[in-house]
Amino acid sequence: MEKKKRELDIVLLLILLASAFLNIYNIWKDDTVNPYYTAAVTSMMQSFHNFFYASFDAAGFITVDKPPVTYQIQTISALIFGMHGWSVILPQALAGVGSVLLMYLLIKPTFGKTAARIASFVMACTPIAVAVARTNNVDALLVFFLLLATWLLFKAIRKGKLIWLLAAFFVVGVGFNTKMLQAYMILPAFLLFYLIAANATIKKKIVSLVSALAVLAAVSLSWPLIVDNIPASKRPYIGSSQTNSVLELAFGYNGIQRLTGQNSGGGQGAPNKDASKEMSSSDNTQAPPNQSSSNSSSSDGKSSNGNMAAPPSNGQMPSGGQGGPPSGGDGGQGGPGGDGGKGGTGTGSKMQSGSGMFGTGTPGPLRLFQQELSDQISWLLPFAIFGIAGLLIAGARERRRLSVEQKETVFWVAWLVPIAGFFSVAEFFHHYYLIMLAPPIAALVGAGWVALVHLYRNQTGWKAWLLPGAIIATTGFELFILRNYNDQIGVGWSIGVGVIGVLSAIALLLFKQRQKPFSYYVSLAALLALLVMPMYWASTPLLYGGNSSLPETGPQLASMSGKGMGMSDATVNEKLIKYLEENNSGAEYLFATTDSNTAAPYIIKTKKAVMAIGGYSGSDPAITLTQFKKLVKEGKVKYFLASGMGRGGNNDIVEWVEKNGKEVASEKWQSSSDQKTENTDSADTSSSKASGENGKMGGPGGMNQSATLYELHADE
């Protein structure tokens, strides 16, 4: 018996290998991924001070907009393997594989090996989960931490040991220091499950939960309270905050604003709804003009996960409200190579072409079924809903007490429903946040399939018909999703999905009395057929290149063909770097500029400090004019690059620079011919082609023709 427990599940191994392939293959072609965060890792490698605070720049002037845990893990990876795009992606890619394994371990003890295999395979094939795992955004690691916490919680229930419960909430606290309040979205499920599943008196349950919540609070607030209690003069400014406070960042910008979409003031934070709509539809918006218009892409001209100057994971508008990223494509006309259309038409970025803020659809109860979001996460959501009914019915016992199967079903439902509800009404989120829904959907599909097959075999009436009903409903919904892509991928896929789904359902309806293996294999074949299109969607970042700043999946990536929304490789102006290094006279900062998008590629390329006076958006009140003048007087800042894209929230500093600085002749530092730059990537939405041909757009790292370099003198 002991030997049997240790047997290797070959099917699981194959699923893990498939997950590893989807998450890892070709990540080595993405040199700097999301430059905003890669710049931070570059800086964090240089000192423990930067490592602790997640400093964006090497001088420790300002932090990124998230807690440090993910970037500390990425920094350790970069220290081990060297600073490469793939080395900062690798932790997230492995976390994605780890999440697939955890799904198996969570489902198998109660629902069996088949359910566990299906759940892990669904998790591996979830399109947005794969897309996020192939970037340096934090969400893949967050989901891994939450699933690890869930495994510890389940162990606490089975073992009846308080230590496992405390460990579970400890890990959720680590999740808070990964992406703040997003980690708390699963707390309702944790609390409810422990109350209904723990074998203890209600008094003991409450005492245990209070203890666990105390651990959660201690771990969650450890880093924020330490940072907030350190004098501001001895630490970096907290990026994307208005009051230089981690707690304000957590509960304001990374908290309530995610739900309301309201601006916190000062031009920073979530754009308002009208600004978002303008960003999504405008043909004239530009990226931060910090790139020579003639610079081209990296040496190989390839990127597996291209980037864009859209908010790295937060939705801020670069350069002080100059709109969002360019509309993409050649010359910025709609989606790459064309008109973009409505969300899900098969061309253009979903953020550009979809309705609602950041192309996430119209808030409402059916938002997850709208074309803007459904192809990223919801393919099997109808099957999961039927699975809930099947699990609650099949798990029922003669006694009125909930069975173990029903209790765990309640847990996954309590994870799914509140988070689905949040995304149904929230104003301020991106497509890749939907990875939070991947675990409960995978669990309910895997366990639900087994329950539905059991009901089909052993029940009569409507309970028996839940299985064919689930197949028909899910088939119909997949055809609804595919209808917008038939012109691009061919109608054959829709026909194939429809035929297999309908024939499977008919076979189950007509031949119910056949022997049991028949129903098992027919229903399994139907489910696998329903997984074909999600798996294709999940593979599109490998096939066509992705978007490292705002990950998404789908055939529309093919139309970008490496030159659309987020597909271009970032470049820096080599002539500018050479000029600054020759003339900087030992200043602490290579140069100062308005925003992090402009600064990031230069930090990555030179490993030197570049001051972004307004943080990511250009509007953080990170430094006053008096403080800036003091730095100039001390010789720490000698050059200022005005991007020509507006002054952000630091008008007084830019005005002072323009009035007192000496303009450097453009021929001394601006390139006039193509210069390929290795080991850099774009965080911009405009392509290098558009940059080169039009002379008007530039990704972060160079400048457009309106950029100006000023020399500042200490005696000013």
Swiss-Prot record:
One of its GO terms (biological process) is response to iron(III) ion. Signal peptide: none annotated. Its EC number is 2.4.1.-. Residues 290-307, 680-694 have a biased composition (Low complexity). Keywords: Cell membrane, Glycosyltransferase, Membrane, Transferase, Transmembrane, Transmembrane helix. Residues 278-289 have a biased composition (Polar residues). It is a multi-pass membrane protein. It is found in: Cell membrane. GO terms for molecular function: pentosyltransferase activity. It holds the Pfam family PMT_2. Residues 260-363, 664-716 are annotated as: Disordered. The chain crosses the membrane at residues 8-28, 44-64, 87-107, 118-135, 137-157, 159-179, 180-200, 206-226, 376-396, 409-429, 433-453, 462-482, 491-511, 518-538. Coiled coil: none annotated. GO terms for cellular component: plasma membrane. Residues 318-347 have a biased composition (Gly residues). Belongs to the glycosyltransferase 39 family. This is Putative mannosyltransferase YkcB. The gene is ykcB.
